[in-house]
Structure formats: C-alpha cells, structure tokens
Amino acid sequence: MKVRASVRRICEKCRVIRRKGRVMVICANPKHKQRQG
C-alpha cells in the first residue's frame, strides 16, 4: 500500500474508489494499491 498526496491509475486495471472518505486505488497488481493521505 502506497500512501500518496495524489493517487492516480498506473495501469488499465486500476480502479479509483472512495472508502470512508479516503480516495484509494485497487488493482489486480498489489504493487498498484494506493491510498490518499
């Protein structure tokens, strides 16, 4: 899980979602998981 000020899609499988007020990226590739923080 990467914590970044600005999250963006890295590949075409990445999905930008909101969970509990946080913007997150979920993907089939675990290296692409990100959270805004």
Curated annotation (Swiss-Prot):
UniProt GO cellular component terms: cytoplasm; ribonucleoprotein complex; ribosome
Biological process according to GO: translation
Range of residues in the leader sequence: none
Classification via Pfam families: Ribosomal_L36 (PF00444)
Keyword check for Transcription regulation: no
PROSITE patterns, per the entry: RIBOSOMAL_L36 (PS00828)
GO MF annotation: an example: structural constituent of ribosome
Alphabetical UniProt keywords: Ribonucleoprotein, Ribosomal protein
Family: Belongs to the bacterial ribosomal protein bL36 family.
InterPro entries from the UniProt entry: Ribosomal_bL36, Ribosomal_bL36_sp
Protein name as it appears in the record: Large ribosomal subunit protein bL36
